Amino acid sequence: MKNRLKVLRAERDWTQAKLAEELEVSRQTINAIEKGKFDPSLPLAFKAARLFAMTIEEIFEGD
């Protein structure tokens, strides 16, 4: 799954650790999602969408 997490995080000058803290997950989870090795759960995708004030579709895109 492609996603814009890394770009959105960089626009805010956030580290992976900061984003992980905001989403209440581990830094390793953020790393895996950004690299496309892990697809976020639906609750996590909703949480990210709320955090960035975007829709899930604007952040995550299926392959």
Predicted regions, residues:
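Short, charged recognition helix plus adjacent turn
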Residues: E11, R50, F60-D63
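Short basic helix-loop element that most often maps to the first helix and adjoining turn
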Residues: N3-E22
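Residues in the recognition helix of alpha-helical DNA-binding motifs
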Residues: E22, I33, G62
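Residues in the helix-turn-helix
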Residues: K18, T29, E58
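Recognition helix of helix-turn-helix/homeodomain-like DNA-binding domains
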Residues: V25-F38
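DNA major-groove recognition helix of helix-turn-helix/homeodomain DNA-binding modules
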Residues: P43-E58
